[in-house]
């Protein structure tokens, strides 16, 4: 995996074994695991700091994983099975424990004992610094091309364009859920095909419950299409002016989006 791009680029350009685009939970965890194995790794993050969404997950409690993770719960079990067999719930818990974050289980969900996302973000940042990972924030990747057996990535950083050279690139830039940016365009520019994307793990839009906006309740939700039951879940729901939110809505939202 070691890069041989020593002659690439001009002075000031940076060369790595792996460049990760995106410093969310997945990108940062990937960087830490690679660096622990001695890989020279860098991360380019568009936002002003890493792990922005991680800080908000689980209503600030930081839901790290689920004890019921199984290939059978995915639309394509055969595709995801090798990944989950190699790195499942036990491995996830062990990884966080190695960073000083013991976990506990509640209602099938894994949370840090501190019950606060801040301790997870701080542990990630501390690991990045300890392992010497090159983290560049406010750095938006704008182009990628194959170059001398690896890749050349252009990024707008601090008002200037910088080039990164890496033998391997990991795309961990997420979807277009809130950014308004086409984060998949870099991959398609390399010739990869994309499938149609729909919202998942998202509120379900509706204006039927304005009178009870802000109310939380434990409820059962059944999603139907004609006489067919598409999903049947029970959990907490949060009524909003313009949507149903909460864990119940999130668990129904994927089937809802596909049914539209």
Predicted regions mapped to residue ranges:
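Extreme N-terminal leader/targeting segments of oxidoreductases
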Residues: 1-18, 36-37
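Glycine-rich active-site loop/strand segments that organize a redox cofactor
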Residues: 58-107
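N-terminal Rossmann-like FAD-binding beta1-loop-alpha1 element of flavoenzymes
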Residues: 16-43
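Redox-cofactor binding/interface segments in oxidoreductases and associated redox assembly factors
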Residues: 21, 56, 171-175
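Predominantly flavin-linked oxidoreductase catalytic cores and closely associated redox partners
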Residues: 118-119, 126-260
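Hydrophobic anchor at the start of a short beta-strand
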Residues: 18, 39-41, 103, 169, ...
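Glycine-rich FAD pyrophosphate-binding loop
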Residues: 35-59
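A cross-family phosphate/adenosyl-ligand binding-site feature
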Residues: 113-115
């Amino acid at each position: 995996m070691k890069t041989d791009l020593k002659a690439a680029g001009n002075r000031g350009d940076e060369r790595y074994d792996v460049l990760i685009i995106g410093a969310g939970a997945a990108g940062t965890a990937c960087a830490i695991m690679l660096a622990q194995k001695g890989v020279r790794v860098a991360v380019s993050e568009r936002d002003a700091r890493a792990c922005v969404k991680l800080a908000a997950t689980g209503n600030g409690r930081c839901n790290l994983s689920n004890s019921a993770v199984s290939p059978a719960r995915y639309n394509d079990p055969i595709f995801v099975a090798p990944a989950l067999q190699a790195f499942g719930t036990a491995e996830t818990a062990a990884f966080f424990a190695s960073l000083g974050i013991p976990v506990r289980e509640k209602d099938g969900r894994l949370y840090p004992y501190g019950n606060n996302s801040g301790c997870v973000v701080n542990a990630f940042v501390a690991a990045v610094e300890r392992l010497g990972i090159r983290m560049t924030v406010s750095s938006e990747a704008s182009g990628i091309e194959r170059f001398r057996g690896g890749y050349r990535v252009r990024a707008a950083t601090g008002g200037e364009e910088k080039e990164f050279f890496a033998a391997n690139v990991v795309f961990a830039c997420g979807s277009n859920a809130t950014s308004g940016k086409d984060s998949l365009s870099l991959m398609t520019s390399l010739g990869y095909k994309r499938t149609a994307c729909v919202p998942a793990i998202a509120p379900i839009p509706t204006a039927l419950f304005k009178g009870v906006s802000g109310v939380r309740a434990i409820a059962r939700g059944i999603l139907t299409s004609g006489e067919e039951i598409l999903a049947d879940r029970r959990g907490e729901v949060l009524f909003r002016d313009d949507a149903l939110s909460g864990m119940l809505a999130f668990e129904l939202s994927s089937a809802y989006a596909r049914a539209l």
